[in-house]
């Protein structure tokens, strides 16, 4: 089963075009840093290592995601085999049978988060096993620290993994809440274990804090302020989240859990740590879903533990039935993927996002049409810039306001260097040339087509940086760099270019 799913992911990693987010992370690896605009740096570090070893091919960049289910499965086995080798094996098998572990080969910020979260939980599970054995055998006795001497290394290792998860994505905070709930409600006498975990995770937190202090607090401005300004409660979002979780966990698993709900409840009480890490983050996402659409990939860092809970609670004679149901569920997905694989690009021309498909699949041809010697290529959005830049093998800056997502160019691109040059700004939609005229001596519209899809480029001659700074960068500052007065800003390269200070007046 592991080899079959691995083969499927390898095939998809080579067959699927690069997405905008993946291309963005590729550029993170090209401009290596210890932090990036949207998120902490781990996926950029991973891709930098992959590039050094295997090069820039799409399949190589996706290799961490391709291997991810094997790493998570190993963590599950290592953590719960001491409880029951057969049940741990069932947990790994059920997890591996889920369609997401056959069909997901995309590299995202969640990829390292999922791995490090799984190993953080595995290490604390082992720590608790050792600690409870130490207490039971009177090594130090109840209330003494003999258990900490016996299990301290595992608690520390869990903290290190939590730190690595923190440097992957801030959603690890939900795992932190789950662990805190466990120690508060079920393991209060071993609270020093939690303290040791926190201490070992703190260096990663300090590293990220320093990066934010010296890089405009972009992680905080993006994740806390800019992306949530217009959030309003909607029951539809809650319903979408519930439906997504029903699909992800699968009707098969949920039906089995309902049929054996008494066993689920008893197992949840006996395995309190597992219950907390499996359920608390998903419940917290449920609470957030009223004001925020929860992405499917967001929950995958906590999703594996649901299958451990299922494997431990179901009667042994019911596990083969669960396996058969999941095989059928998986087969439906594989047949759908096989059917899609038989189609060609023109057959999708009536799909709403056909333009994005063309851009992803034909990026090299688009670049070839627009590129001319002596002209700088840009785009009006991060997704297009990242994908087309990957195809061109040169960084393609974003021109204009862009969106609140992925504003990495604010930190690394100095538009002053393009003063006096001719630019071509590639766009998916037909532009209004009046929006570009203030920044050039002259502008003209160039029209192209690729696989029946029109796209455009605005050619501007003799770029005027001062006008761009006053017209575009000042508005970007007003929208995305309104730091709260209480937030200390040590350095901000964007503001330094705009006004010569760490923060600029809006």
Name each model feature, range by range.
Residues 105-113:
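Short acidic/glycine- and proline-prone juxtamembrane loop motifs at membrane-interface regions
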Residues 296, 322-373, 382-406, 425-504:
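Membrane-proximal, lumen/periplasm-facing interface regions of secretory-pathway glyco-
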Residues 30, 73-75, 94, 112-133, ...:
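Specific aromatic-rich, kink-prone transmembrane helix
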Residues 63-85, 119, 123:
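Transmembrane-helix motifs of polytopic, lipid-linked glycan transferases
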Residues 164, 175-269, 277, 282, ...:
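Transmembrane-lumen/periplasm boundary regions of multi-pass, lipid-linked membrane glycan transferases
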Residues 81-86, 120-157, 263:
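Membrane-interface transmembrane helices that cradle and orient dolichyl/undecaprenyl
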Residues 31, 151-169, 180-181, 285:
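Membrane-interface alpha helices of multi-pass inner-membrane proteins
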Residues 2, 88-98, 162, 166:
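Short helix- or helix-capping micro-motifs
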């Amino acid at each position: 089963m592991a080899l079959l799913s691995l083969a499927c992911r390898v095939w998809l990693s080579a067959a699927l075009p690069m997405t905008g987010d993946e291309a963005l992370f590729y550029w993170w690896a090209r401009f290596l840093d210890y932090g990036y605009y949207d998120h902490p740096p781990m996926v950029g570090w991973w891709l930098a290592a992959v590039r050094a070893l295997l090069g820039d091919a799409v399949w190589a960049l996706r290799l961490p995601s391709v291997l991810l289910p094997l790493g998570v499965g190993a963590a599950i086995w290592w953590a719960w085999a001491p409880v029951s080798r057969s049940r741990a094996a069932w947990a790994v098998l059920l997890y591996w049978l889920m369609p997401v572990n056959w069909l997901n080969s995309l590299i995202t910020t969640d990829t390292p988060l999922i791995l490090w979260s799984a190993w953080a939980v595995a290490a604390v599970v082992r720590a608790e096993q050792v600690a409870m054995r130490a207490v039971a055998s009177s090594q130090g006795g109840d209330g003494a620290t003999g258990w900490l001497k016996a299990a301290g290394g595992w608690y520390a290792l869990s903290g290190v993994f939590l730190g690595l998860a923190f440097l992957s994505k801030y959603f690890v905070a939900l795992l932190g809440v789950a662990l805190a709930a466990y120690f508060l409600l079920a393991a209060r006498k071993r609270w020093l274990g939690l303290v040791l975990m926190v201490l070992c995770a703190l260096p990663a937190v300090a590293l990220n804090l320093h990066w934010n202090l010296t890089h405009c607090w972009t992680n905080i401005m993006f994740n806390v302020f800019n992306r949530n300004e217009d959030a309003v409660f909607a029951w539809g979002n809650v319903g979408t989240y519930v439906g997504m979780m029903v699909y992800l966990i699968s009707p098969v698993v949920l039906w089995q859990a309902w049929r054996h709900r008494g066993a689920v409840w008893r197992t949840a009480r006996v395995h309190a740590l597992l219950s907390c890490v499996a359920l608390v983050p998903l419940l917290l996402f449920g609470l957030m879903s009223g004001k925020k659409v929860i992405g499917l990939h967001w929950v995958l860092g906590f999703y594996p533990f649901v299958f451990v809970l299922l494997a431990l609670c179901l009667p042994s004679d019911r596990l083969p039935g669960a396996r058969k149901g999941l095989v059928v569920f998986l087969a439906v997905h594989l047949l759908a993927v096989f059917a899609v694989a038989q189609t060609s690009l023109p057959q999708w021309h009536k799909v709403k996002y056909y333009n994005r498909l063309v851009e992803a699949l034909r990026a090299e041809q688009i670049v070839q049409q627009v590129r001319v010697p002596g002209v700088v290529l840009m785009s009006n959005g991060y997704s297009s810039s990242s994908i087309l830049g990957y195809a061109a093998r040169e960084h393609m800056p974003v021109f204009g306001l862009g969106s609140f997502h992925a504003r990495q160019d604010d930190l690394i691109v100095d538009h002053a260097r393009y003063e006096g040059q001719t630019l071509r700004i590639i766009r998916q939609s037909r532009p209004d040339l009046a929006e570009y005229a203030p920044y050039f001596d002259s502008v003209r519209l160039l029209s192209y087509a690729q696989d029946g899809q029109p796209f455009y480029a605005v050619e501007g001659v003799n770029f005027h940086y001062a006008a761009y700074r006053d017209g575009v960068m000042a508005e970007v500052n007003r929208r995305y760099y309104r730091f709260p007065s209480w937030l200390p800003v040590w350095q901000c390269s964007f503001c330094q270019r705009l006004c010569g200070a760490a923060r600029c007046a809006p």
